[in-house]
Amino acid sequence: MLREGARLGWALRPNSPKLKNFLNTFLQDNREGTLFGNIIRNRYIRDFDWAENAAGAEELTRYRALSALFRKYGTDYGMDPTLLAAQGFQESRLDQSVRSHVGAVGVMQLLPSTAEDKNVGIPNIDELAPNIEAGAKYMAFLKARYFSGPELEGINGSLLALASYNAGPGRIRRLRREAGERGYDPNQWFDNVEVIVAEQVGRETVQYVSNIFKYYLTYRWINSADAERAAARRATGIEDAP
């Protein structure tokens, strides 16, 4: 149990005793008051509005309607489809009709000039599928060009690419170097490079990446719940409609 009276819970199938025991042990070892437990509480649990925003009925319908496109283009360009979907939610609430005051277009809020750049080269971003493809390809370009290498383990290369999508790759590369010079880990976004970015750029980019990561966690929970539900239906001989 993370806390009593919470608005968000974690449901398990009753025939998953190993998973239940693992989670109970993890929560006991990382309860509030421990270092990791406090980090988790302060970053993700204290305020659940972000999860409710991404997991509302209308938002879930939109997410599920676009999931196949994010899977396709995430796979095509070597990016995590769930992270791309979370980015799309942050940019536009997954709404292709959105246009910004500076001319950014659609789900991924790309400028036409970015989509036309030789490193992207995807036309027709007024249409849904090309818009998501262009966003995925641009993210893949940022990550491969500026934030790849064995030192960037796990999701950190993608988080730095997200920061660059918002604030520009040249600026984030410079601030990453400054983070290393000032004793922070230049290969870790959270609590390291983000500190320097907040100081030098302001909270907008830090909040942008933080929001996307929270939506990413929400979508991962949704994906897991959907997979569990589908498995249970198959086990009982109930097939989902095509």
Feature names for model-found ranges:
Residues 24, 28-32, 45, 49, ...:
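Sec-exported extracytoplasmic/periplasmic mature domains
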Residues 239-242:
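Short, solvent-exposed mixed-charge patches
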Residues 8-13, 53-60, 71-73, 95-98, ...:
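Second-shell loop/turn segments in exported
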Residues 97-123, 130-141, 186-188, 212:
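Substrate-binding/active-site groove segments that recognize
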Residues 45-94, 129-132, 146-150:
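Export/targeting segments at the very N-terminus of extracytoplasmic proteins
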Residues 2-12, 18-22, 156-225:
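Catalytic and substrate-binding regions of cell-wall glycan-acting enzymes that process beta-1,4-linked
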